[in-house]
Amino acid sequence: SYYFGATLDEWAPMSARRATYFREPAAPSTSVPCHALYPPGSITMIEALAMRDHLNGFDKYIPRDDRWPERVWDWPIEMPYRQGMRLRNMIWTGGQVPFEEAMNQGKAVHVGDPLAQASFTMGYVNDIVEAFGKTTQDYALLVCYFASDGSQAATEAFVGAIADTIGGELPPLTLVPQPKMHSDDITVEIWGVAKG
């Protein structure tokens, strides 16, 4: 989902409302700030991906397997979403941010060091994938939102920080530089898909 704003106070009410439409354990989620929405006046937008099966002429639920490594943070408000979920042979991670380990206070780590935040955040994404018995070489896609001045140098530095956590060939990357992320203290959000 996307929300118009750049503070926890702007994120929380809309996120809490969206969460009422999902039961725990809900699919992994990502919520990032945006700076313009269409139509004008909109304050949130939701995108969703869904997987169902078709068997004997009927629409069927696909069994899910979820993981939440102990080190990975929790939201500062109650949410039904899981941090990682496997459906068939695909592992989806929720959007990871540089929050304190195993906490739900919404406090950022490595404040003022965007590259350290990128590496730290990728550590969470890697932990989730590894909880399913997979490695960084199983990534099929990483989607990275990050605060940036939009320069090539800033993008290359960000990709370098991500590459250092992968330890091999990079998967396909979707890079979304933004003038500002969630707050001045949180400069990155990353989610991924892995073969599982």
Label every model-predicted segment.
Residues F4-A140, F146-G196:
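N-terminal presequence-like segments and the immediate start of the first folded domain
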